[in-house]
Protein backbone atom coordinates (compact mmCIF):
# COMPACT_ATOMS: atom_id res chain seq x y z
CA UNK A 1 0.00 0.00 0.00
CA UNK A 2 1.20 3.53 -0.75
CA UNK A 3 2.78 5.56 2.00
CA UNK A 4 2.06 9.00 3.38
CA UNK A 5 3.05 11.18 0.44
CA UNK A 6 1.05 9.46 -2.29
CA UNK A 7 -2.50 10.15 -1.11
CA UNK A 8 -5.32 7.66 -1.64
CA UNK A 9 -4.61 4.73 0.62
CA UNK A 10 -2.41 6.93 2.79
CA UNK A 11 -5.42 7.36 5.07
CA UNK A 12 -4.74 3.85 6.33
CA UNK A 13 -1.29 4.67 7.66
CA UNK A 14 0.06 7.03 10.30
CA UNK A 15 2.13 10.11 9.48
CA UNK A 16 5.22 8.13 10.39
CA UNK A 17 5.75 7.45 6.69
CA UNK A 18 7.26 10.17 4.54
CA UNK A 19 7.69 8.22 1.30
CA UNK A 20 5.28 6.09 -0.64
CA UNK A 21 5.83 2.46 -1.52
CA UNK A 22 7.71 1.56 -4.65
CA UNK A 23 5.08 0.66 -7.30
CA UNK A 24 6.36 -2.91 -7.58
CA UNK A 25 6.26 -3.33 -3.81
CA UNK A 26 2.79 -1.80 -3.73
CA UNK A 27 1.55 -4.46 -6.14
CA UNK A 28 3.47 -7.17 -4.30
CA UNK A 29 2.00 -6.12 -0.96
CA UNK A 30 -1.61 -5.72 -2.04
CA UNK A 31 -4.23 -8.41 -1.52
CA UNK A 32 -7.29 -6.55 -2.81
CA UNK A 33 -7.38 -8.64 -5.99
CA UNK A 34 -8.38 -11.71 -3.99
CA UNK A 35 -9.50 -10.66 -0.52
CA UNK A 36 -12.33 -8.65 -2.07
CA UNK A 37 -13.96 -12.09 -1.84
CA UNK A 38 -14.48 -11.26 1.85
CA UNK A 39 -16.43 -8.05 1.18
CA UNK A 40 -19.81 -9.24 2.48
CA UNK A 41 -18.23 -10.70 5.60
CA UNK A 42 -16.21 -7.52 6.14
CA UNK A 43 -19.40 -5.48 5.98
CA UNK A 44 -21.21 -7.86 8.35
CA UNK A 45 -18.37 -7.73 10.87
CA UNK A 46 -18.11 -3.95 10.64
CA UNK A 47 -21.84 -3.47 11.17
CA UNK A 48 -21.74 -5.66 14.29
CA UNK A 49 -18.69 -3.72 15.51
CA UNK A 50 -20.35 -0.35 14.89
CA UNK A 51 -23.52 -1.37 16.73
CA UNK A 52 -21.46 -2.60 19.67
CA UNK A 53 -19.49 0.66 19.84
CA UNK A 54 -22.77 2.54 20.04
CA UNK A 55 -24.28 0.24 22.67
CA UNK A 56 -21.12 0.50 24.79
CA UNK A 57 -21.12 4.30 24.58
CA UNK A 58 -17.80 4.44 22.75
CA UNK A 59 -19.58 6.37 20.00
CA UNK A 60 -23.09 7.78 20.00
CA UNK A 61 -26.01 5.65 18.87
CA UNK A 62 -26.59 8.17 16.10
CA UNK A 63 -23.03 7.72 14.87
CA UNK A 64 -23.40 3.95 15.03
CA UNK A 65 -26.54 4.22 12.90
CA UNK A 66 -24.72 6.43 10.41
CA UNK A 67 -21.90 3.90 10.16
CA UNK A 68 -24.36 1.07 9.61
CA UNK A 69 -26.16 3.06 6.93
CA UNK A 70 -22.89 3.81 5.18
CA UNK A 71 -21.83 0.18 5.26
CA UNK A 72 -25.17 -0.91 3.82
CA UNK A 73 -24.75 1.74 1.11
CA UNK A 74 -21.42 0.13 0.19
CA UNK A 75 -23.15 -3.25 0.07
CA UNK A 76 -25.72 -1.84 -2.35
CA UNK A 77 -23.01 -0.25 -4.46
CA UNK A 78 -21.17 -3.57 -4.64
CA UNK A 79 -24.35 -5.37 -5.73
CA UNK A 80 -24.81 -2.80 -8.48
CA UNK A 81 -21.18 -3.09 -9.58
CA UNK A 82 -20.46 0.48 -8.49
CA UNK A 83 -17.98 -0.31 -5.71
CA UNK A 84 -14.65 -0.64 -7.48
CA UNK A 85 -11.64 -0.91 -5.16
CA UNK A 86 -8.21 -0.49 -6.67
CA UNK A 87 -4.58 -1.19 -5.87
CA UNK A 88 -4.47 2.01 -3.84
CA UNK A 89 -6.72 0.31 -1.27
CA UNK A 90 -4.28 -2.54 -0.56
CA UNK A 91 -6.99 -4.77 0.90
CA UNK A 92 -10.74 -5.11 1.36
CA UNK A 93 -10.63 -3.51 4.83
CA UNK A 94 -9.03 -0.27 3.63
CA UNK A 95 -11.29 -0.27 0.56
CA UNK A 96 -14.39 -0.30 2.75
CA UNK A 97 -13.00 2.26 5.18
CA UNK A 98 -11.93 4.62 2.39
CA UNK A 99 -15.38 4.52 0.82
CA UNK A 100 -17.08 4.89 4.21
CA UNK A 101 -15.08 8.04 4.96
CA UNK A 102 -15.97 9.39 1.52
CA UNK A 103 -19.65 8.81 2.29
CA UNK A 104 -19.75 9.96 5.94
CA UNK A 105 -16.76 12.20 6.47
CA UNK A 106 -15.24 12.26 10.00
CA UNK A 107 -17.82 9.80 11.36
CA UNK A 108 -16.46 7.16 8.99
CA UNK A 109 -13.09 7.43 10.67
CA UNK A 110 -14.59 6.16 13.95
CA UNK A 111 -15.42 2.67 12.66
CA UNK A 112 -11.98 1.24 13.35
CA UNK A 113 -12.06 2.22 17.03
CA UNK A 114 -11.13 -0.72 19.25
CA UNK A 115 -10.09 -3.12 16.52
CA UNK A 116 -7.21 -3.90 14.15
CA UNK A 117 -7.07 -5.41 10.71
CA UNK A 118 -5.51 -8.41 12.47
CA UNK A 119 -8.68 -9.38 14.34
CA UNK A 120 -10.83 -8.00 11.52
CA UNK A 121 -9.44 -10.30 8.84
CA UNK A 122 -9.61 -13.29 11.16
CA UNK A 123 -13.28 -12.53 11.75
CA UNK A 124 -14.00 -12.10 8.04
CA UNK A 125 -12.26 -15.33 7.14
CA UNK A 126 -14.15 -17.33 9.76
CA UNK A 127 -17.50 -15.90 8.69
CA UNK A 128 -16.73 -16.68 5.06
CA UNK A 129 -15.56 -20.22 5.74
CA UNK A 130 -18.48 -20.96 8.05
CA UNK A 131 -20.90 -20.24 5.23
CA UNK A 132 -18.91 -22.32 2.76
CA UNK A 133 -18.79 -25.22 5.18
CA UNK A 134 -22.58 -25.22 5.25
CA UNK A 135 -22.68 -25.05 1.44
CA UNK A 136 -20.28 -27.98 1.13
CA UNK A 137 -22.30 -30.07 3.55
CA UNK A 138 -25.37 -29.57 1.36
CA UNK A 139 -23.39 -30.66 -1.71
CA UNK A 140 -22.09 -33.73 0.08
CA UNK A 141 -25.61 -34.66 1.15
CA UNK A 142 -26.71 -34.34 -2.47
CA UNK A 143 -23.87 -36.64 -3.50
CA UNK A 144 -24.91 -39.19 -0.90
CA UNK A 145 -28.46 -39.07 -2.25
CA UNK A 146 -27.19 -39.59 -5.79
CA UNK A 147 -25.18 -42.62 -4.69
CA UNK A 148 -28.11 -43.98 -2.72
CA UNK A 149 -30.50 -43.63 -5.65
CA UNK A 150 -28.09 -45.61 -7.81
CA UNK A 151 -27.72 -48.21 -5.07
CA UNK A 152 -31.48 -48.58 -4.71
CA UNK A 153 -31.67 -49.32 -8.44
CA UNK A 154 -29.13 -52.13 -8.13
CA UNK A 155 -30.25 -54.14 -5.12
CA UNK A 156 -29.75 -57.43 -6.98
CA UNK A 157 -27.04 -56.39 -9.43
CA UNK A 158 -23.67 -58.06 -8.93
CA UNK A 159 -20.23 -56.60 -9.57
CA UNK A 160 -16.79 -58.16 -9.23
CA UNK A 161 -15.06 -57.18 -6.01
CA UNK A 162 -11.33 -56.56 -6.16
CA UNK A 163 -8.27 -56.62 -3.97
CA UNK A 164 -4.94 -55.57 -5.51
CA UNK A 165 -7.08 -54.85 -8.61
CA UNK A 166 -7.46 -58.61 -8.99
CA UNK A 167 -10.85 -60.31 -8.95
CA UNK A 168 -11.55 -61.33 -5.35
CA UNK A 169 -15.20 -61.99 -4.49
CA UNK A 170 -18.50 -60.95 -6.08
CA UNK A 171 -20.40 -58.12 -4.44
CA UNK A 172 -23.82 -56.59 -4.56
CA UNK A 173 -23.38 -53.36 -6.55
CA UNK A 174 -25.51 -51.50 -4.02
CA UNK A 175 -23.06 -52.59 -1.32
CA UNK A 176 -20.18 -51.12 -3.31
CA UNK A 177 -21.95 -47.77 -3.67
CA UNK A 178 -22.95 -47.76 -0.01
CA UNK A 179 -19.26 -47.88 0.89
CA UNK A 180 -18.84 -44.44 -0.65
CA UNK A 181 -21.85 -43.12 1.24
CA UNK A 182 -20.09 -44.17 4.44
CA UNK A 183 -16.89 -42.39 3.38
CA UNK A 184 -18.76 -39.20 2.58
CA UNK A 185 -20.53 -39.36 5.94
CA UNK A 186 -17.17 -39.41 7.67
CA UNK A 187 -16.24 -36.36 5.62
CA UNK A 188 -19.41 -34.59 6.72
CA UNK A 189 -18.71 -35.48 10.35
CA UNK A 190 -15.17 -34.14 10.08
CA UNK A 191 -16.32 -30.91 8.48
CA UNK A 192 -18.95 -30.46 11.17
CA UNK A 193 -16.20 -30.84 13.76
CA UNK A 194 -14.07 -28.28 11.92
CA UNK A 195 -17.01 -25.87 11.87
CA UNK A 196 -17.02 -25.81 15.66
CA UNK A 197 -13.48 -24.45 15.70
CA UNK A 198 -14.18 -22.04 12.86
CA UNK A 199 -17.09 -20.62 14.83
CA UNK A 200 -15.03 -18.74 17.44
CA UNK A 201 -14.75 -14.95 17.36
CA UNK A 202 -11.37 -13.17 17.37
CA UNK A 203 -13.02 -9.75 17.02
CA UNK A 204 -11.88 -7.38 19.73
CA UNK A 205 -8.47 -8.98 20.17
CA UNK A 206 -7.20 -5.95 18.22
CA UNK A 207 -3.62 -6.10 16.94
CA UNK A 208 -2.37 -8.65 19.47
CA UNK A 209 -2.86 -7.42 23.05
CA UNK A 210 -6.52 -6.47 23.23
CA UNK A 211 -7.66 -2.84 23.52
CA UNK A 212 -8.09 -0.18 26.19
CA UNK A 213 -11.39 0.83 24.56
CA UNK A 214 -14.34 -0.44 26.67
CA UNK A 215 -15.76 -2.81 24.04
CA UNK A 216 -17.95 -5.88 24.51
CA UNK A 217 -16.52 -8.86 22.63
CA UNK A 218 -19.40 -11.11 23.65
CA UNK A 219 -21.78 -8.64 22.02
CA UNK A 220 -20.18 -8.85 18.59
CA UNK A 221 -19.67 -12.60 18.87
CA UNK A 222 -23.38 -13.12 19.52
CA UNK A 223 -24.39 -10.69 16.78
CA UNK A 224 -22.29 -12.58 14.24
CA UNK A 225 -23.46 -16.01 15.34
CA UNK A 226 -20.21 -17.17 16.90
CA UNK A 227 -20.45 -19.73 19.68
CA UNK A 228 -17.78 -18.08 21.83
CA UNK A 229 -14.73 -15.83 21.74
CA UNK A 230 -11.02 -16.58 21.78
CA UNK A 231 -9.80 -16.47 25.37
CA UNK A 232 -6.33 -15.21 24.45
CA UNK A 233 -5.79 -12.20 22.19
CA UNK A 234 -2.43 -13.45 20.87
CA UNK A 235 -3.97 -16.76 19.90
CA UNK A 236 -6.98 -15.01 18.39
CA UNK A 237 -5.01 -13.06 15.78
CA UNK A 238 -2.39 -15.73 15.05
CA UNK A 239 -4.57 -18.84 14.79
CA UNK A 240 -4.97 -20.37 11.35
CA UNK A 241 -5.49 -23.92 12.58
CA UNK A 242 -9.05 -23.76 11.30
CA UNK A 243 -7.83 -23.11 7.75
CA UNK A 244 -5.45 -26.06 7.95
CA UNK A 245 -8.15 -28.28 9.43
CA UNK A 246 -10.62 -27.37 6.73
CA UNK A 247 -8.07 -28.01 3.99
CA UNK A 248 -7.13 -31.35 5.56
CA UNK A 249 -10.79 -32.37 5.74
CA UNK A 250 -11.31 -31.20 2.17
CA UNK A 251 -8.29 -33.25 1.13
CA UNK A 252 -10.00 -36.37 2.46
CA UNK A 253 -13.16 -35.45 0.58
CA UNK A 254 -11.02 -35.25 -2.55
CA UNK A 255 -9.40 -38.60 -1.75
CA UNK A 256 -12.80 -40.26 -1.60
CA UNK A 257 -14.02 -38.57 -4.77
CA UNK A 258 -10.82 -39.58 -6.52
CA UNK A 259 -11.16 -43.22 -5.52
CA UNK A 260 -14.62 -43.38 -7.03
CA UNK A 261 -13.45 -41.37 -10.04
CA UNK A 262 -10.66 -43.88 -10.62
CA UNK A 263 -13.15 -46.73 -10.54
CA UNK A 264 -15.49 -44.98 -12.97
CA UNK A 265 -12.58 -44.45 -15.36
CA UNK A 266 -11.80 -48.17 -15.23
CA UNK A 267 -15.45 -49.15 -15.49
CA UNK A 268 -16.00 -46.95 -18.54
CA UNK A 269 -13.09 -48.45 -20.47
CA UNK A 270 -13.72 -51.10 -23.12
CA UNK A 271 -11.64 -53.50 -21.04
CA UNK A 272 -14.23 -53.35 -18.25
CA UNK A 273 -17.36 -51.92 -19.94
CA UNK A 274 -19.22 -51.92 -16.62
CA UNK A 275 -20.74 -48.46 -17.21
CA UNK A 276 -21.88 -46.34 -20.13
CA UNK A 277 -21.27 -42.60 -19.90
CA UNK A 278 -23.99 -40.24 -21.07
CA UNK A 279 -23.29 -37.58 -23.66
CA UNK A 280 -23.98 -34.92 -21.02
CA UNK A 281 -21.02 -35.98 -18.89
CA UNK A 282 -18.39 -37.04 -21.43
CA UNK A 283 -16.38 -35.46 -24.21
CA UNK A 284 -14.93 -36.59 -27.52
CA UNK A 285 -11.57 -36.55 -29.23
CA UNK A 286 -10.45 -33.90 -31.71
CA UNK A 287 -8.90 -36.66 -33.83
CA UNK A 288 -10.53 -40.01 -33.06
CA UNK A 289 -14.28 -39.89 -33.76
CA UNK A 290 -15.09 -43.10 -31.88
CA UNK A 291 -13.90 -41.79 -28.50
CA UNK A 292 -16.04 -40.91 -25.49
CA UNK A 293 -13.73 -39.67 -22.76
CA UNK A 294 -14.44 -39.73 -18.99
CA UNK A 295 -13.32 -36.14 -18.46
CA UNK A 296 -15.35 -35.54 -15.28
CA UNK A 297 -13.73 -38.28 -13.19
CA UNK A 298 -10.33 -37.57 -14.74
CA UNK A 299 -10.53 -33.91 -13.74
CA UNK A 300 -11.67 -34.81 -10.24
CA UNK A 301 -8.71 -37.15 -9.93
CA UNK A 302 -6.36 -34.47 -11.25
CA UNK A 303 -7.66 -31.66 -9.06
CA UNK A 304 -6.76 -33.60 -5.92
CA UNK A 305 -3.20 -32.40 -6.33
CA UNK A 306 -4.28 -28.78 -6.05
CA UNK A 307 -6.03 -29.32 -2.74
CA UNK A 308 -3.22 -31.48 -1.34
CA UNK A 309 -0.75 -28.78 -2.40
CA UNK A 310 -2.72 -26.09 -0.58
CA UNK A 311 -2.64 -28.18 2.59
CA UNK A 312 1.13 -28.52 2.38
CA UNK A 313 1.46 -24.82 1.60
CA UNK A 314 -0.57 -23.75 4.62
CA UNK A 315 1.35 -26.02 6.97
CA UNK A 316 4.65 -24.75 5.64
CA UNK A 317 3.53 -21.13 5.81
CA UNK A 318 2.45 -21.34 9.46
CA UNK A 319 5.13 -23.58 10.96
CA UNK A 320 7.80 -20.94 11.53
CA UNK A 321 5.73 -17.91 12.50
CA UNK A 322 6.40 -16.25 15.86
CA UNK A 323 3.44 -14.75 17.71
CA UNK A 324 1.41 -12.89 16.80
CA UNK A 325 0.32 -11.63 13.37
CA UNK A 326 2.67 -11.81 10.39
CA UNK A 327 2.21 -10.74 6.78
CA UNK A 328 2.72 -14.39 5.81
CA UNK A 329 -0.92 -14.90 6.78
CA UNK A 330 -1.91 -13.07 3.60
CA UNK A 331 -0.99 -16.31 1.83
CA UNK A 332 -3.75 -18.27 3.56
CA UNK A 333 -6.58 -16.77 1.54
CA UNK A 334 -5.86 -17.85 -2.00
CA UNK A 335 -5.10 -21.36 -0.79
CA UNK A 336 -8.30 -21.50 1.23
CA UNK A 337 -10.47 -19.88 -1.43
CA UNK A 338 -9.24 -22.27 -4.11
CA UNK A 339 -9.63 -25.30 -1.84
CA UNK A 340 -13.23 -24.37 -1.08
CA UNK A 341 -14.06 -23.72 -4.73
CA UNK A 342 -12.28 -26.80 -6.08
CA UNK A 343 -13.77 -29.18 -3.53
CA UNK A 344 -17.31 -27.91 -4.00
CA UNK A 345 -17.00 -28.02 -7.79
CA UNK A 346 -15.73 -31.60 -7.70
CA UNK A 347 -18.49 -32.79 -5.38
CA UNK A 348 -21.11 -31.12 -7.56
CA UNK A 349 -19.66 -32.63 -10.74
CA UNK A 350 -19.58 -36.12 -9.25
CA UNK A 351 -23.18 -35.71 -8.07
CA UNK A 352 -24.28 -34.87 -11.60
CA UNK A 353 -22.27 -37.80 -12.92
CA UNK A 354 -24.08 -40.15 -10.55
CA UNK A 355 -27.49 -38.57 -11.14
CA UNK A 356 -27.48 -38.48 -14.92
CA UNK A 357 -24.02 -39.23 -16.25
CA UNK A 358 -23.60 -42.99 -16.14
CA UNK A 359 -25.56 -46.20 -16.50
CA UNK A 360 -24.41 -49.53 -15.10
CA UNK A 361 -24.37 -52.34 -17.66
CA UNK A 362 -26.09 -55.09 -15.68
CA UNK A 363 -25.64 -57.78 -18.33
CA UNK A 364 -21.93 -57.12 -18.61
CA UNK A 365 -21.57 -57.14 -14.83
CA UNK A 366 -23.42 -60.44 -14.58
CA UNK A 367 -21.19 -61.97 -17.23
CA UNK A 368 -18.12 -60.70 -15.41
CA UNK A 369 -18.93 -62.38 -12.11
CA UNK A 370 -19.70 -65.66 -13.87
CA UNK A 371 -16.40 -65.82 -15.75
CA UNK A 372 -13.78 -65.90 -13.00
CA UNK A 373 -12.69 -67.68 -9.83
CA UNK A 374 -14.15 -65.20 -7.35
CA UNK A 375 -16.26 -68.00 -5.89
CA UNK A 376 -13.17 -69.96 -4.85
CA UNK A 377 -13.41 -68.83 -1.23
CA UNK A 378 -16.90 -70.28 -1.11
CA UNK A 379 -15.53 -73.72 -1.96
CA UNK A 380 -13.23 -73.39 1.04
CA UNK A 381 -16.17 -72.25 3.20
CA UNK A 382 -18.19 -75.20 1.91
CA UNK A 383 -15.46 -77.62 2.95
CA UNK A 384 -15.13 -75.95 6.36
CA UNK A 385 -18.86 -76.52 6.86
CA UNK A 386 -18.16 -80.20 6.11
CA UNK A 387 -15.59 -80.33 8.89
CA UNK A 388 -12.41 -79.70 6.88
CA UNK A 389 -9.94 -77.35 8.64
CA UNK A 390 -9.84 -73.98 6.86
CA UNK A 391 -6.13 -74.03 5.98
CA UNK A 392 -6.46 -77.50 4.51
CA UNK A 393 -9.51 -76.40 2.54
CA UNK A 394 -7.66 -73.31 1.36
CA UNK A 395 -4.76 -75.38 0.02
CA UNK A 396 -7.11 -77.83 -1.65
CA UNK A 397 -9.05 -75.10 -3.47
CA UNK A 398 -5.79 -73.58 -4.65
CA UNK A 399 -4.96 -76.89 -6.30
CA UNK A 400 -8.40 -77.00 -7.92
CA UNK A 401 -7.98 -73.49 -9.32
CA UNK A 402 -4.57 -74.45 -10.71
CA UNK A 403 -6.09 -77.40 -12.52
CA UNK A 404 -8.89 -75.26 -13.95
CA UNK A 405 -6.42 -72.67 -15.19
CA UNK A 406 -4.35 -75.38 -16.85
CA UNK A 407 -7.44 -76.75 -18.59
CA UNK A 408 -9.00 -73.37 -19.42
CA UNK A 409 -12.20 -73.99 -17.49
CA UNK A 410 -14.01 -72.53 -14.47
CA UNK A 411 -14.91 -74.09 -11.13
CA UNK A 412 -18.51 -74.48 -12.23
CA UNK A 413 -17.37 -76.54 -15.23
CA UNK A 414 -15.98 -79.36 -13.07
CA UNK A 415 -18.16 -82.43 -12.69
CA UNK A 416 -18.97 -83.90 -9.29
CA UNK A 417 -16.60 -86.78 -10.01
CA UNK A 418 -13.77 -84.34 -10.75
CA UNK A 419 -14.48 -82.47 -7.53
CA UNK A 420 -14.45 -85.65 -5.51
CA UNK A 421 -10.97 -86.41 -6.81
CA UNK A 422 -9.88 -83.58 -4.52
CA UNK A 423 -12.05 -84.42 -1.50
CA UNK A 424 -14.70 -87.01 -0.78
CA UNK A 425 -16.76 -84.61 1.34
CA UNK A 426 -17.79 -82.69 -1.76
CA UNK A 427 -21.37 -83.45 -2.83
CA UNK A 428 -23.88 -82.32 -5.45
CA UNK A 429 -24.90 -79.28 -3.40
CA UNK A 430 -21.53 -77.64 -4.13
CA UNK A 431 -22.70 -76.41 -7.53
CA UNK A 432 -25.55 -74.48 -5.90
CA UNK A 433 -23.07 -72.94 -3.46
CA UNK A 434 -20.95 -71.65 -6.36
CA UNK A 435 -23.75 -69.66 -8.04
CA UNK A 436 -22.75 -65.95 -7.92
CA UNK A 437 -25.99 -64.74 -6.33
CA UNK A 438 -25.72 -67.48 -3.74
CA UNK A 439 -22.11 -66.47 -3.05
CA UNK A 440 -23.28 -62.93 -2.36
CA UNK A 441 -26.44 -63.86 -0.46
CA UNK A 442 -24.64 -65.95 2.17
CA UNK A 443 -22.45 -63.02 3.28
CA UNK A 444 -24.81 -62.39 6.17
CA UNK A 445 -22.43 -60.93 8.76
CA UNK A 446 -23.31 -57.41 9.88
CA UNK A 447 -21.97 -54.95 7.34
CA UNK A 448 -21.59 -57.67 4.70
CA UNK A 449 -22.67 -57.74 1.08
CA UNK A 450 -25.53 -60.23 1.59
CA UNK A 451 -28.73 -58.96 0.04
CA UNK A 452 -30.60 -58.85 3.35
CA UNK A 453 -27.80 -56.86 4.98
CA UNK A 454 -27.69 -54.50 2.02
CA UNK A 455 -31.43 -53.94 2.29
CA UNK A 456 -30.96 -52.99 5.94
CA UNK A 457 -28.38 -50.39 4.97
CA UNK A 458 -30.46 -49.04 2.10
CA UNK A 459 -33.38 -48.51 4.47
CA UNK A 460 -31.09 -46.94 7.08
CA UNK A 461 -29.58 -44.44 4.67
CA UNK A 462 -32.86 -43.57 2.98
CA UNK A 463 -34.42 -42.82 6.35
CA UNK A 464 -31.40 -40.85 7.50
CA UNK A 465 -31.05 -38.73 4.37
CA UNK A 466 -34.79 -38.12 4.03
CA UNK A 467 -34.97 -36.94 7.63
CA UNK A 468 -32.11 -34.51 7.12
CA UNK A 469 -30.00 -36.00 9.91
CA UNK A 470 -26.41 -35.08 9.15
From Swiss-Prot:
Question: Which species expresses this protein natively?
Answer: Prochlorococcus marinus (strain MIT 9303)
Record field: catalytic activity: 2-(N(omega)-L-arginino)succinate = fumarate + L-arginine
Positions of disulphide bridges: none
The record's listing under PROSITE patterns reads:
FUMARATE_LYASES
- Could you confirm whether the keyword Amino-acid biosynthesis appears in this record? yes
Q: What is this protein called?
A: Argininosuccinate lyase
Q: What is its EC number?
A: 4.3.2.1
Question: Which taxonomic lineage is given here?
Answer: Bacteria, Bacillati, Cyanobacteriota, Cyanophyceae, Synechococcales
Top EC class for this record: lyase
The record's InterPro entries line, in alphabetical order, gives: Arg_succ_lyase_C, Argininosuccinate_lyase, Fumarase/histidase_N, Fumarate_lyase_CS, Fumarate_lyase_fam, Fumarate_lyase_N, L-Aspartase-like
Q: Which GO terms describe its biological process?
A: arginine biosynthetic process via ornithine; L-arginine biosynthetic process
This protein's superkingdom?
Answer: Bacteria
Amino acid sequence: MAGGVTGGSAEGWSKRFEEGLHPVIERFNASISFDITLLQEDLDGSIAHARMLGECGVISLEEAAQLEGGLEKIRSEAAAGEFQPGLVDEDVHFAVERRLIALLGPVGKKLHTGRSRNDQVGTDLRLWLRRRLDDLDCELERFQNALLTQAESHRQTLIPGYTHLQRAQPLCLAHHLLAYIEMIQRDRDRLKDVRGRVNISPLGAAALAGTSVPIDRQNTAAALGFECIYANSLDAVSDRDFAVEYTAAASLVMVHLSRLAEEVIFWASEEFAFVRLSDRCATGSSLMPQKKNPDVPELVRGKCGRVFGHLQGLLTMIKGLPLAYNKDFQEDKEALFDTVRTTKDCVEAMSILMEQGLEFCSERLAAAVESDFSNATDVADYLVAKGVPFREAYQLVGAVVKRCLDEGILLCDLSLEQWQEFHSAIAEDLHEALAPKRVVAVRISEGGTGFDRVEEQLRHWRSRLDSGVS
